[in-house]
Amino acid sequence: MKVRLGVDMMGGDHDPLVVWEALGEVLLSSIGEQPVEFTVFATSDVHHQLMNSPLSRSVRIVTAEDFVSMEDSLLAAVRKKRSSMALGLDALQQGDLDGFVSSGNTAALVTLARSKIPMIPAVPRPALLVSVPTLSGFAVILDVGATVSVNPDEMVGFARMGLAYRQSLSSNSNQPFTLGLLNIGSEERKGTDSHKQTFRMLRNIFGSAFLGNIESGDVFSGKVDIVVTDGFTGNVFLKTAEGLFDFLRRILGDRLEKSIKMQFDYTIYPGSIISGLSRLVIKCHGKSHGTALFGGISGAIDLARANVCSRIADRFGDNVV
């Protein structure tokens, strides 16, 4: 199956050429595998820089009139109808792409994607879903930044999407998965009124699969497979975890064994999936360097090839009680 992947070259904290280099590495690594067709979206000045690159013969380049910056408000982003982000999402909506990757403005990407890409039926609100390494493999966390404030019904929707995602990637259709609610303590009485209500709803719906409240340290232990949280808390958790890993890597350097680096390196996982959409949109961290971009783009290819959004939609319906 040929995968058609769109990549937004613009809007991240890095130079667009860093994205270009990551694309080249992905193409080299995929030689001999099923073909991948890349379409990149960039402004005319960046397009001009890319024309002399040998890679330009293997990648389709679409020229955008503008790009969405990290400083742009949502209104400013929406008004940029011909931005690299908007053109990429338009191509995805029209069926010209199987997935789209951007490391640009998160709020703008979520808003534009939601306005252009249909939601999966019965999904109350999209969420950013990310995989993190654990002692037993990996866990998924959602939401990590799509929505700052959510209600208990929407948190339950996140739980169902996380479960549907794990089920869609499992080779064993009967494999059990466990869920936990990220909170300030493991006791049922901990947290805000919203957390307490969410706790009760998750327990009633998922039964023994819901292991209750979990603290941040429990995430990496592998205690649960799906971590449910609001976008504010999830984003703070994720950025803290990424910062801690980078800190340890700098401090320990070569003393940190390669196997350990690989086990806990978040950059080998895809970026955040905007779960709840009917088509695949991946958000890479704005500060993503070459390795993280390589992981995000490679992961997007794998997810597109697995037709993960359609499988989530099928599973989500099964998980609605």
Swiss-Prot record:
Presence of the UniProt keyword Transmembrane in the record: no
Location(s), subcellular: Cytoplasm
Keywords of this entry: Cytoplasm, Lipid biosynthesis, Lipid metabolism, Phospholipid biosynthesis, Phospholipid metabolism, Transferase
CC per GO annotation: cytoplasm
Keyword field contains Cell division: no
Protein name: Phosphate acyltransferase
Family annotation (NCBIfam families): PRK13846.1
Pathway participation: Lipid metabolism; phospholipid metabolism
MF term (GO), any: phosphate:acyl-[acyl carrier protein] acyltransferase activity
HAMAP family: PlsX
Family statement: Belongs to the PlsX family.
Subunit structure and binding partners: Homodimer. Probably interacts with PlsY.
Taxonomy, superkingdom: Bacteria
Gene, per the UniProt record: plsX
Functional description taken from the UniProt entry: Catalyzes the reversible formation of acyl-phosphate (acyl-PO(4)) from acyl-[acyl-carrier-protein] (acyl-ACP). This enzyme utilizes acyl-ACP as fatty acyl donor, but not acyl-CoA.
GO BP, sorted A to Z: fatty acid biosynthetic process; phospholipid biosynthetic process
UniProt EC number: 2.3.1.274
Catalytic activity: a fatty acyl-[ACP] + phosphate = an acyl phosphate + holo-[ACP]
